[in-house]
């Protein structure tokens, strides 16, 4: 009997029990979160257990150390060294294999000329033509069954000028080498192609060149390995459809990591990056984009090095790609379901997949069936007289308290914008915590104040039903979004799970009422809508403890009579909190509204008073023996809280550093933080008003700490620096001044840092800082001259870029006025690999250029002076990008054809000055080597001393990356 009493006491709906259960729930969620983020570090292969895997990892780590020894962008000589090392490793691995073939684009002098939309800005209408000389290394492993559609594995070996490329994309490259080594030993059933491609960073050009190779016809599937962060776990960033997601599910059994929230965020352009997967997808391939994704403030900086990553991160990508490639290479694939997929993993133990279209159908079923069932049960309970009547005040307090929490949250967010808008960059936990605690604390205060003056007998059940209604509305809206996006909003699945579990909890409550015993006596209104003068001190205390769950005796989830008898131990006060009423037994209506004071029980009418108190007492006792709340709690709180918290963490973990990329991203992150904190709070709001004073005190304390951290702590530290973009621009048409451009977020961050540089502090150098678009700030000053070339004389920067016009028939009398104009240019640039030509006409709205020709002199064919590549565009060409491999080949030979104004608009105008058909050509050439030296007059000097100065003297709370494809840009302009 004692044990039974203890058991009942533990399960009763009390403040302490609820608070303890909340503590346990959030403790478990925290432990699961830590387990999820740390487990992969403990799963490295051991030599005695998995010798082959251990060898693959150790060899890959050694390869990574070698290829990340220096910066190796496409525009550098180090890029060739990495290419040569990879080619050597590929030849070592393939050896004399009878089914392996190697193709080197550099040796075969493969080049392409093609029209390309800006891959990093889909909204751009700038027409671009790109010429690219490739040094991709391709390996073909012919499968046992070559009729099977082949699999491509791809990674790029170039880095940015400011990063060693350990994560982006050294780990992908060495993982490809490990996969190649594995599949050489275990011949695949289907043909595998490995593409070690070059120049992904500035146009996804290596991937584009792949489709100029005959082997591209052999492959249908692709695994792209990428790094858009700097370490951590490699996530399934995106996948083609439900079939490919299920293939990942079936193959990656150890440490799967993926979430379709990333996919939706990436396609929605919340992340301003792109990977080679885009090119493969646009060319009809299906597959998997596996990438590192955080932290973005170290991405493309000097900290993208082997020092800031680990073998655990490398093994996670290597092992994931190995499991996936081995499965695809050896199994027949079911690829029938090509609808977008919703997918997620559970702490790296289990991977779940559902078609977004199927999810939409289930949403429709939920939306249709749930209100029908709920309304039906409500009508049954009304008919059986088991439904409790509630006033409008009772029904509105939960949504109004939620609305008030949102309003207060909005006011707090305004304070963040005013005082510390970039706080998310340092630590998104504090603002999320502040938003979350503020919402639940506001709800607690308002509901309990309302209950103090106007007690509500069944607040929990009302709140659960209202939560169901709110979530039904949200699900309706998100289902519409899912349908209108052609099922590409694949990150909305958490709301479907939350709605389903909340619906079950609400239906169970309504079912209990519908199946309750019919009663003739109605207890009247359980929620008092007016304040009574009669109220004892003990009763007020009990009301504060919560009268919200006065269950009817007929409730299927209430205790037995035995339980009710044992309630005496609880010492529940029997004094009414409101006026005594005589209850009409047939209709449940009050027959007296007489008010009483402390003397009333001694006077006439005391019998009526005692009857009311007795009824009230019995009802209040039932509150403490209500065990249904545990079922409702377990349905609504643990699973939805974990899924919603994990989803918000996924979003913030990927996006929090994007606040450095502009004000739009800042508002996006702030909005996600606000909405996410509300979603995390929703599962506990129906219960939270019931927590004890310790819990609410800790909540208030956590809010104060979180708000202080959010508003007052500086957003940038050594470990979470502000990423700043650098370039040094020399415009030959305006002199030889080497103007340094430093681009970063507004907020008085850049100028104080620049003013402390020695070259500025001890000179009269002026810094000009101006606001540019999207909340960014550009600071410019004249920096130290770069030393791009080794020379024995004075460095003449104007000799770096020279433009020679070989032919121009614009003013030729032999050309008809209706005939296109043709010009031929020779662009002489020293030790260079990349230039851009931009075309513009002062007299025509659109670029009149219709045809571009590139004359290429091949080393392997000296008998052919030039090989021409030509491309035409009826809509006009705005830009020509040039990329060549040979540093010793100092010229680009270009042909340009453009329409005269007469052909484009049909107007015949007098052109006395002969300028209406002029074509302005702006030339920009790029150099990306900075961590090296030139020899000037016998003395070794650094190539870009202005950048060295920033690296050496800027505080550690700053990190630096390139603004454009080179660190030094030399510009010139001519008119044709």
From Swiss-Prot:
Q: An example Gene Ontology cellular component term from the record?
A: vacuolar membrane
Which residues are noted as glycosylation sites? 96, 121, 189, 212, 217, 656, 768, 796, 811, 866, 937
Entry cofactor note text? Binds 2 Zn(2+) ions per subunit.
Amino acids binding Zn(2+) 2 = 168, 201, 300
Name the Pfam families on file.
Answer: Peptidase_M28 (PF04389), PFF1_C (PF22250), PFF1_TM (PF22251)
**Topology relative to the membrane, per the entry?**
Multi-pass membrane protein
Q: Spell out the family assignment given in the record's similarity comment.
A: Belongs to the peptidase M28 family.
Name the record gives this protein: Vacuolar membrane protease
Specify the species. Answer: Saccharomyces cerevisiae (strain JAY291)
């Amino acid at each position: 009997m004692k044990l039974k009493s203890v058991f009942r006491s533990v399960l009763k709906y009390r403040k302490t029990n609820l608070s303890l259960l909340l503590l346990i729930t959030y403790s478990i969620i925290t432990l699961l979160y830590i387990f999820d983020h740390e487990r992969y570090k403990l799963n490295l292969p051991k030599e005695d257990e998995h010798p082959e895997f251990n060898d693959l990892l150790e060899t890959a780590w050694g390869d990574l150390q070698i290829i990340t020894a220096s910066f190796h962008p496409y525009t550098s000589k180090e890029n060739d060294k990495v290419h040569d090392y990879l080619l050597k490793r590929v030849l070592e691995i393939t050896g004399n294999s009878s089914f392996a073939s190697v193709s080197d684009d550099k040796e075969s002098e493969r080049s392409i000329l093609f029209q390309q939309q800006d891959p990093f800005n889909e909204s751009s209408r700038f027409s671009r033509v790109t010429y690219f000389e490739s040094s991709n290394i391709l390996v073909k492993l012919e499968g046992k069954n070559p009729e099977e559609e082949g699999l491509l594995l791809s990674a790029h070996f170039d880095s940015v000028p400011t990063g060693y490329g350990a994560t982006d994309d050294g780990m992908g490259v060495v993982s490809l080498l490990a996969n190649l080594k594995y599949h050489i030993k275990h011949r695949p059933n289907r043909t595998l192609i490995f593409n070690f491609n070059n120049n992904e960073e500035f146009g996804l050009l290596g991937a584009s060149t792949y489709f100029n190779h005959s082997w591209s016809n052999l492959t249908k599937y692709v695994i792209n390995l990428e790094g858009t962060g700097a370490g951590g776990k490699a996530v399934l960033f995106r996948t083609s459809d439900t079939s490919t997601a299920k293939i990942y599910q079936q193959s990656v059994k150890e440490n799967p990591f993926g979430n379709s929230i990333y996919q939706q965020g990436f396609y929605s352009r919340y992340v301003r990056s792109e990977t080679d997967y885009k090119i493969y997808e646009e060319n009809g391939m299906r597959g998997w984009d596996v990438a590192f994704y955080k932290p973005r403030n170290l991405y493309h900086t000097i900290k993208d090095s082997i020092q800031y990553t680990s073998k655990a991160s490398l093994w996670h990508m290597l092992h994931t790609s190995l499991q996936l490639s081995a499965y695809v290479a050896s199994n027949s694939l079911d690829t029938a379901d090509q609808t977008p997929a919703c997918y997620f993993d559970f702490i790296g133990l289990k991977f779940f997949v559902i078609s977004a279209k199927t999810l939409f159908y289930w949403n429709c079923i939920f939306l249709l069936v749930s209100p029908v069932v709920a309304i039906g049960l409500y009508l049954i309970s009304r008919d059986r007289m088991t439904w409790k009547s509630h006033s409008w005040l009772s029904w509105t307090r939960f949504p109004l308290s939620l609305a008030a929490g949102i309003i207060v949250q909005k006011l707090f967010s305004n304070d963040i914008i005013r005082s510390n808008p970039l706080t998310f960059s340092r630590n998104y936990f504090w603002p999320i915590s502040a938003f979350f605690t503020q919402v639940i604390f506001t709800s607690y205060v308002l509901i309990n104040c309302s209950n103090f003056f106007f007690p509500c007998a069944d607040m929990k059940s009302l709140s659960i039903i209202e939560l169901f209604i709110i979530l039904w509305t949200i699900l309706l809206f998100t289902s519409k979004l899912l349908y209108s996006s052609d099922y590409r909003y694949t990150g909305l699945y958490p709301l479907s799970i939350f709605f389903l579990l909340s619906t079950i909890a609400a239906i169970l409550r309504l079912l209990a009422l519908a199946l309750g015993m019919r009663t003739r006596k109605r207890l009247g209104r359980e929620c008092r809508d007016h304040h009574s003068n009669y109220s004892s001190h003990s009763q007020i205390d009990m009301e504060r403890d919560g009268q919200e769950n006065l269950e009817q005796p007929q409730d299927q989830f209430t205790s037995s009579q035995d339980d009710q008898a044992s309630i005496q131990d609880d010492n529940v006060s029997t004094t009414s909190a409101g006026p005594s009423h005589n209850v009409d037994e047939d209709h449940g209506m009050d027959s007296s509204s007489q008010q009483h004071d402390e003397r009333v029980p001694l006077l006439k009418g005391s019998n009526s008073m005692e009857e009311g108190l007795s009824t009230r007492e019995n009802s209040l006792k039932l509150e403490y023996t209500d065990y249904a709340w545990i079922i409702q709690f377990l349905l609504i709180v643990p699973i939805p809280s974990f899924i919603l918290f994990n989803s918000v963490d996924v979003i913030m973990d990927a996006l929090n550093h994007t606040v450095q990329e502009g004000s739009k991203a800042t508002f996006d992150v702030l909005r996600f933080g606000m909405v996410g904190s509300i979603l995390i709070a929703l599962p506990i709001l129906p219960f939270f008003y019931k927590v004890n004073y310790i819990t609410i005190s800790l909540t208030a304390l956590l809010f104060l700490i979180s708000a202080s951290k959010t508003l007052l702590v500086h957003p940038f530290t050594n470990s979470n620096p502000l990423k700043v973009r650098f370039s040094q621009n020399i415009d030959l048409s305006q002199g030889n001044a080497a103007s340094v451009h430093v681009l970063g977020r507004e907020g008085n961050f850049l100028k104080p840092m620049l003013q402390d540089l020695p070259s500025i502090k001890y000179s009269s150098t002026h810094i000009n800082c101006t606001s540019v678009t999207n909340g960014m700030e550009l600071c410019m000053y004249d920096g130290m001259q770069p030393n791009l070339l080794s020379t024995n004389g004075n460095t003449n920067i104007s000799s770096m870029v020279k433009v020679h016009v070989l032919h121009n028939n614009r003013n030729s009398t032999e050309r008809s006025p209706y005939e296109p104009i043709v010009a031929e240019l020779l662009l002489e640039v020293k030790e260079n690999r990349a230039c851009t030509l931009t075309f513009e006409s002062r007299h025509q709205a659109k670029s009149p250029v219709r045809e571009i020709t590139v004359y290429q002199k091949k080393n392997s064919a000296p008998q052919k002076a030039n090989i021409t590549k030509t491309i035409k565009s009826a809509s006009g060409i705005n830009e020509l990008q040039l990329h060549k491999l040979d540093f010793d080949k100092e010229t680009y030979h270009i042909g340009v054809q453009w329409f005269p104004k007469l052909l484009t608009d049909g107007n015949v105008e007098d052109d006395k000055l002969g300028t209406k058909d002029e074509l302005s050509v702006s030339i920009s050439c790029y150099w990306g080597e900075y961590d090296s030296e030139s020899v000037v007059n016998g003395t070794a000097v650094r190539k870009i001393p202005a950048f060295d100065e920033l690296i050496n003297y800027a505080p550690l709370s700053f990190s630096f990356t390139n603004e454009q494809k080179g660190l030094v840009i030399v510009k010139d302009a001519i008119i044709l």
